From Swiss-Prot:
Keyword Cytoplasm found: yes
GO biological process, one term: tRNA modification
Species per Swiss-Prot/TrEMBL record: Clostridium perfringens (strain SM101 / Type A)
Keywords: ATP-binding, Cytoplasm, Ligase, Nucleotide-binding, RNA-binding, tRNA processing, tRNA-binding
Amino-acid positions noted as binding ATP in the UniProt annotation, renumbered to this chain: 7-20, 102, 171, 196
Family to which the UniProt record says this protein belongs: Belongs to the TmcAL family.
InterPro entries registered for this protein in UniProt: Rossmann-like_a/b/a_fold, tRNA(Met)_cyd_acetate_ligase
Protein name per UniProt: tRNA(Met) cytidine acetate ligase
Catalytic activity: cytidine(34) in elongator tRNA(Met) + acetate + ATP = N(4)-acetylcytidine(34) in elongator tRNA(Met) + AMP + diphosphate
Entry's EC annotation: 6.3.4.-
Gene Ontology cellular component annotations, sorted alphabetically: cytoplasm
Record gene name: tmcAL
GO MF entries: ATP binding; ligase activity, forming carbon-nitrogen bonds; tRNA binding
Keyword ATP-binding: yes
Amino acid sequence: MNITGIITEYNPFHLGHELHLKNSKEITNCDGVICVMSGNFVQRGLPALTDKWTRTKMALEAGVDLVVELPTLFATSSAEFFAFGAVSLLNSLNVVNNICFGSECGDIDLIKKLSEIIVNEPPIFKEYLKDYLKEGLPFPKARSEALMKYLDYNNYKTDFSYLEKVLNSSNNILAIEYCKSLYKLQSTIKPFTIQRLGADYNDEELSKNEIASASAIRKSIYTSNIEESLDFMPEYSYNLLKNTSFSDLDKMFDLVKYAIVSNPNILKEIPEASEGIDNKIIQNIGKANSLDELINLCKSKRYSYTRLNRILCHILLNVNKDLLSLRKYSPNYVRILGFNNKGREILKEIKKNSEINIVNKLSKAKTDPLLEFDIKATNIYSFLNPSVKINSDYLISPIIFR
């Protein structure tokens, strides 16, 4: 069986996702699709618009065969750890032949070339990177500058203004990290990319003439009404959203504020909250009236909006250093969120070919620390979204789509 893996958030599932899924099937000529999807918290460091089971239903309606959960620890981390968690999970299933992801550039050879340099870390590249970090540049920017300088030094024939754009575009960054993880794992999975069409990943405005970003759809749902987003998502996705509730970002801010005020030392447990940003957050927590306001008061050249969002999310989820250290390792279980008949066949192949622990229903006995963290994340999410109850992870079985 020729199986393709895709890495998604579906927050929410829209027309761009539908196109990516269709094209992924075509370009890889696959027999089935496994989707690794973020759970109730996503890579921007925010609660998902709607819960992971509703989004699983969207994926299955769209034609995904098997949906598995990306553990929350990876799902709420930077591109490097997000990609490693997802790719290593797909790799450990021992049934995935291809991985297909979107990118702004659509050039798999360039993406592979850049990821190879990063993995091999030639000495000159490392020196350039060290120099840019000393200048105070945030790591992603320092790395992109070091890559360009290294390629220039090696007389690599390219348009460097184009290359700069490639290295600083959200989906390209993730694409490079996916390939980097494949190299590190010495995986036999073959990477494919599809050029992203329509609005920019970070574009927050809906436009009738193009495929909208998930950011724009979420903003529309939060600020006006769901009807405005109908033209930008499949009908099945819209119908599922129409009949569910959404996470409340104001409640998230209240919980983050409570966590910081009641225990200011919580920031010392998060390695990302260093270089004085911990003090800046504590100083501004009383001045801000919303999550957005707090982040804007604290952000700087080194600490971007999204990076701060992830720090605040880790405060909310009470992440500690011991837990964060687990991001270096591949998950040793796979949590099944849903499947169709073909997905059931793929599960049989996984059982036959892989030693990974397959989790269908949760037991209240002691489990893997990553899985325990997922359960805690869902319980915290239940304070933000009324459609989810405490202990939903124990109560809700994988969705079977017929």
